[in-house]
Amino acid sequence: MAIDKTKNQHRINEAIRVKEVRLVGDNVEQGVYNIQEARRIAESQDLDLVEISPNADPPVCRVTDYQKFVYQLKKKAKEQKAKSVKIVIKEIRFGPQTDDHDYNFKLKHAKEFLQEGSKVKAYVFFRGRSILFKEQGEVLLLRFANDLEDFARVEQMPILEGKRMTIMLTPKSASKKGHTPPKTQVEASKQANESAETEEEKKRCHPTKPVL
């Protein structure tokens, strides 16, 4: 196959300028060949000679269809990218004197972040002399972790860094398609539905007789 593109990622055919190569590929007797013989073998099968390991001694070349070879490389790279997990960390800030309304508001958002598969980094920021209440900040963060125990596990316990006391939470299970409730809530809902269906079935099979 007459393809000679020197600007490609891999050198092919006439662009391979070495004396000998190690040949691999289907329907090829693997071994070391001089470059002219390797090209002749590729041409006899109407395929390309593709250099896949230029730093080997001698360089390794594959007898293959170059277009299909590139397609498979791109496909593999795309699959690997899809499998790679992108870790997202959401930050939630508290003050040492956070009231219940603000706390519950941030707790709700933390649940949403965890259900989406994101980690949550919650911290208490101490201004000036409020650092004297660092124990109060630790209690707040531990309460926060306890209220999220159905959604997350503690990756890092509260630690004081400068004016911040931080805790790191990681999701127990990620649901990127929606906000899936905890398993216990799902099971409870299922049991309630089954119970209601059973009662309805009993009523159909044993109708209540009117009182005379």
From Swiss-Prot:
| Gene3D superfamilies for the chain | Translation initiation factor 3 (IF-3), C-terminal domain, Translation initiation factor 3 (IF-3), N-terminal domain
> Quaternary form?
Monomer.
Q: Where in the cell is it found?
A: Cytoplasm
Asked whether the keyword Acetylation is assigned, the reply is: no
| GO molecular function terms listed in the Swiss-Prot or TrEMBL record | ribosome binding; translation initiation factor activity
What does it do?
IF-3 binds to the 30S ribosomal subunit and shifts the equilibrium between 70S ribosomes and their 50S and 30S subunits in favor of the free subunits, thus enhancing the availability of 30S subunits on which protein synthesis initiation begins.
The answer on whether this UniProt entry bears the keyword Cytoplasm reads yes
Q: Which GO terms describe its cellular component?
A: cytosol; membrane
Fetch the NCBIfam families from UniProt: infC (TIGR00168)
| Name under which the protein is recorded | Translation initiation factor IF-3
Q: Which SUPFAM superfamilies match?
A: Translation initiation factor IF3, C-terminal domain, Translation initiation factor IF3, N-terminal domain
